[in-house]
């Protein structure tokens, strides 16, 4: 419970402002410090590592206090935001020197994890999205996303699964949900991050329709394809409402709302996206992601665009081929690639600088850098336009979107000094010759010291005494004379202060000069501020061409990055077409091969999947042999091909894939009461209900979370379903330890067995990591356990038990369904066990007619043709015989 704060005038003002933002940490400007009080102070001290103190606050009361100097805001604000806290910045709105009353204060900015504009909080190559999720009843919803730092505004409608994938891909820093929908959000979505609850009216459709039209400058949303999409209007408008609530009103850079077109994107569900480690390794401290391998971008907006390309691979063949041709050109022409990279280095974050212009937050130094960036954009255009048209028409067409903005460059260069400061008031901003009054005032200010020296010499000679002229904040300019000479001071001087051994005086000419010089400095500050704001307004007229330039440079940067990684890593250009075959020759895992120790090479493998021949590959082999890597490798090569990248292989032919689905690795959700097996079955069911003829499916160890026979039966049935599915023949890689599944090759024409080879040499495992035709009969589990450091006594005992179980399976077929007895291990001091004599005797030797009947029935079973389902039915039949009264 919050402690009551005694309302002194200052604290009363604080409480009134705090009441408007109870869920935010309030940074309250007091003099040269930002202060926090009470619970805010406790939280700030913990997050920032600053001292928590107490101050008197009325009779027998105290209040917690923590603060930091105002100039350290850029240091401490990012820490609060990254801790997931909303921060309200309350500044002094008037000069304390000009008022004798309580200084007027107000909120100048409300910073939240999703609404950030400061470079010190933002990550260069990551977007900082604010999301709004609208979930009415009915199973459909909408998600809108805005990066206020770039102006990118997106919206999409769809199923819960689609929206969950978008959350995984875009990774917003903050999600807005209706207060009443919070519990449903937590139950439904796997995404975990900062969620802020808002009132229902925030998503009101009709109000939001008008708000969107006003922001985007349109009379109707029809041209954006949103007129008949109330779900999209609700979520997109909610974002604009939230920006208004957080005092972000300068939004002229938000000029369009783009729908995320699911029809043009490869489908990747959220689990597949995470398990393939596309943007982030599942163990970031040790591993790398696909993004880490492919990202050689130079500009921040190029890095952000590459993340989006990897999140949403294309299924548009024309666009894939366009990117491929540009990448191929840049692979061939290393000199052009190098020169483009040098130009990109001079452009910086054009996208975010443009947004700062719109919000009126661009600094003088950034404005000057903008002119330099536009010069570099011109160099890019010149480089590409000089490139032969016949070599790559698409590259030149892309560069044609660049606008040089030469008039703007000239305006900035003429208006600003060559090296302007980072902020107004810290040095000369406006160049000489722009404003005559400013030039005169600067001349007065610059030559003021010369005047003071002359005045000091003149007065000293006239009075015949030594003296000095100085300045302080109390008296302004004054003359200081030692006590020994005060008797010779002119009568026109006025004494202002007596010191030990000296007196301080003023006289009329000195005060006149003071008024003039101090007035000049204040006037310079006002004039520079006005002239600079006029320049920013002129720059703002170019927001749309600047945004187009940023988008074009980002594309060129991404394509150049893909060309550089292709050249460096020996990638090849894949054939991508409308065929139904995936044929990869000597494919390599793009991430693993970059992590291998120096001198060690990745073992390449061929993979061929086709709807008419090898639709399903059943892959067996021991743990650590490389089955999982092979599955992921195939998926990543396919994904890379469909963003327009070259791929790690000797050759690759990719028939267009519309979705990749994986069931790879365990993903327990114990906190929700869901076991590994339950989650596995849910994910498998989702895949089977979503597949198409152009899907690529990866199953790794499906069914291992339950009993052996249950697992085999489920895996068998799923393979049959995928093979016989009337809606299409999805290409499937099925890695398993269930060697019984090898029998499917002889039963289903498009199922082929492969194994990742391994050998046991003198008791040691040798992993060859080569995919070869045919199934494997051994898992080498005990050998892998030995490699993992399992105590020798355990692996020796496990070997004994394995031999007994294999003998029982081989010789006691009639023991099906009965308990197998294992001989007890010998005590450490005893001699080793003598053989496998402890396997249970056959109970069919007993003189019992029912057991004899069972024996006859079992002997009639053809084990070679028995399916798992038929075996389970036979067991049920035998069980009924044993339990039926005779």
What is the predicted function of each stretch?
Residues 2-4, 12-16, 23, 536, ...:
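Conserved phosphate-binding elements of NTP-dependent enzyme cores
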Residues 2-329, 338, 345, 349-358, ...:
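Charged catalytic and DNA/RNA-contacting regions of genome-maintenance
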Residues 38-41, 229, 298, 303, ...:
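ATPase nucleotide-binding head domains, primarily ABC-like/P-loop NTPase cores
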Residues 54-67, 149, 153, 217-226, ...:
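Short hinge/gating elements
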Residues 359, 363, 373-376, 393, ...:
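Charged, surface-exposed helical/loop "interaction arms" that form contiguous linear patches used
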Residues 499, 503-537:
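Extended, charged coiled-coil "arm/hinge" scaffolds of SMC/Rad50-like chromosome-maintenance ATPases
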Residues 846-886:
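C-terminal tails and terminal domains of large nucleic-acid-associated
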């Amino acid at each position: 419970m919050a402690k009551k704060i005694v309302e002194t005038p200052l604290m009363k003002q604080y409480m009134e402002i705090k009441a408007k933002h109870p869920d935010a940490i309030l940074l309250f400007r007091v003099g040269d410090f930002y202060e926090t009080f009470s619970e805010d102070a406790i939280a700030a001290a913990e997050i920032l590592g600053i001292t928590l103190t107490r101050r008197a606050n009325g009779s027998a009361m105290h209040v917690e206090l923590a603060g930091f100097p105002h100039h350290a805001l850029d240091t401490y604000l990012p820490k609060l935001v990254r801790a997931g806290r909303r921060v309200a910045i309350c500044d002094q709105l008037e000069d304390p020197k000009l008022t004798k009353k309580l200084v007027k204060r107000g909120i100048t900015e409300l910073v939240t994890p999703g609404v950030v504009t400061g470079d010190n909080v933002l990550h260069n190559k990551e977007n900082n999205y604010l999301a709004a999720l609208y979930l009415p009843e009915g199973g459909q919803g909408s998600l809108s996303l805005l990066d206020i730092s770039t102006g990118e505004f997106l919206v999409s409608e769809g199923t819960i699964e689609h929206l969950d994938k978008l959350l995984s891909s875009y990774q917003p820093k903050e999600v807005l949900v209706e207060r009443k929908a919070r519990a449903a959000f937590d139950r439904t979505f796997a995404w975990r991050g900062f969620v802020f609850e808002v009132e229902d009216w925030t998503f009101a459709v009709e109000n939001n329709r008008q708000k969107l039209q006003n922001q985007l400058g349109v009379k109707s949303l029809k041209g954006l394809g949103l007129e008949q999409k109330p779900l999209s209007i609700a979520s997109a408008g909610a974002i604009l409402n939230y920006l208004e609530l957080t005092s972000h009103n300068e939004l002229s850079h938000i000029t369009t709302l783009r729908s995320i077109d699911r029809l043009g994107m490869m489908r990747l569900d959220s689990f597949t996206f995470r398990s393939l480690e596309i943007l982030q390794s599942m163990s970031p401290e040790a591993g790398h992601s696909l993004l880490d391998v492919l990202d050689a971008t130079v500009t921040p907006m190029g890095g952000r665009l590459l993340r989006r390309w990897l999140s949403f691979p294309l299924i548009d063949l024309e666009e894939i081929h366009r990117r491929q041709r540009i990448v191929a050109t840049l692979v061939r022409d290393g000199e052009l690639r190098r020169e483009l990279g040098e130009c990109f280095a001079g452009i910086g974050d054009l996208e975010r600088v443009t947004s700062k212009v719109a919000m009126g937050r661009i600094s003088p130094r950034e404005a000057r850098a903008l002119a330099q960036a536009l010069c570099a954009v011109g160099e890019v255009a010149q480089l590409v336009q000089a490139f032969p048209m016949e070599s790559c028409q698409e590259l030149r067409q892309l560069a044609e979107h660049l606008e040089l903005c030469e008039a703007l460059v000239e305006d900035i260069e003429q208006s600003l000094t060559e090296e302007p400061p980072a902020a107004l008031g810290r040095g000369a901003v406006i160049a000489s010759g722009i404003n005559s009054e400013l030039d005169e005032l600067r001349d007065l200010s610059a030559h003021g010291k010369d005047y003071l020296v002359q005045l000091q010499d003149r007065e000293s000679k006239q009075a015949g005494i030594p003296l000095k002229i100085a300045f302080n904040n109390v008296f302004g300019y004054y003359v200081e004379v030692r006590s020994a000479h005060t008797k010779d001071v002119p009568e026109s001087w006025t004494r202002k202060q007596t010191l030990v051994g000296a007196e301080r005086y003023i006289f009329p000419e000195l005060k006149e000069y003071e008024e003039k010089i101090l007035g000049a400095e204040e006037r310079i500050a006002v004039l520079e501020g006005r002239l600079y704001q006029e320049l920013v307004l002129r720059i703002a007229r170019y927001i749309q061409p600047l945004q187009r330039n940023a988008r074009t440079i980002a594309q060129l940067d991404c394509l150049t990055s893909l060309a550089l990684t292709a050249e460096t890593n020996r990638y090849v250009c894949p054939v991508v077409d409308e065929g139904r075959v995936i044929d990869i020759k000597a494919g390599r895992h793009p991430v693993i091969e970059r992590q291998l120790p120096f001198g060690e090479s990745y073992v390449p493998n061929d993979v061929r999947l086709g709807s008419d021949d090898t639709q399903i590959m059943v892959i067996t082999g021991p743990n650590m042999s490389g089955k999982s890597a092979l599955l992921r490798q195939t998926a990543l090569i396919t994904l890379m091909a469909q963003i327009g990248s070259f791929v790690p292989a000797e050759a690759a032919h990719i028939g267009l894939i519309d979705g990749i689905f994986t069931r790879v690795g365990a993903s327990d959700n114990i906190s929700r009461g869901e076991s590994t097996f339950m989650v596995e079955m849910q994910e498998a069911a989702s895949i089977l209900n979503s597949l198409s003829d152009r899907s690529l499916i990866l199953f790794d160890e499906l069914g291992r979370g339950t009993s052996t026979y249950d697992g085999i039966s489920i895996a068998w049935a799923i393979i049959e379903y995928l093979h016989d599915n009337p809606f299409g023949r999805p290409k499937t890689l099925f890695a398993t330890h269930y060697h019984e599944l090898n029998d499917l090759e002889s039963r289903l024409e498009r199922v082929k067995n492969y194994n990742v080879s391994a050998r046991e040499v003198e008791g040691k495992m040798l992993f060859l990591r080569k995919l070869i035709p045919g199934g494997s009969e051994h898992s080498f589990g005990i050998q892998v356990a030995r490699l993992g450091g399992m105590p020798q006594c355990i692996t020796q005992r496990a070997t004994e038990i394995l031999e007994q179980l294999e003998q029982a399976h081989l010789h006691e077929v009639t023991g099906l369904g009965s308990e197998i007895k294992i001989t007890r291990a010998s005590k450490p001091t005893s001699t080793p066990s003598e053989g496998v004599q402890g396997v249970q005797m056959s109970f069919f030797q007993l003189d019992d007619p029912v057991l004899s009947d069972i024996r006859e029935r079992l002997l009639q079973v053809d084990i070679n043709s028995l399916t798992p389902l038929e075996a389970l039915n036979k067991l049920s039949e035998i069980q009924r015989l044993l339990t039926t009264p005779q």
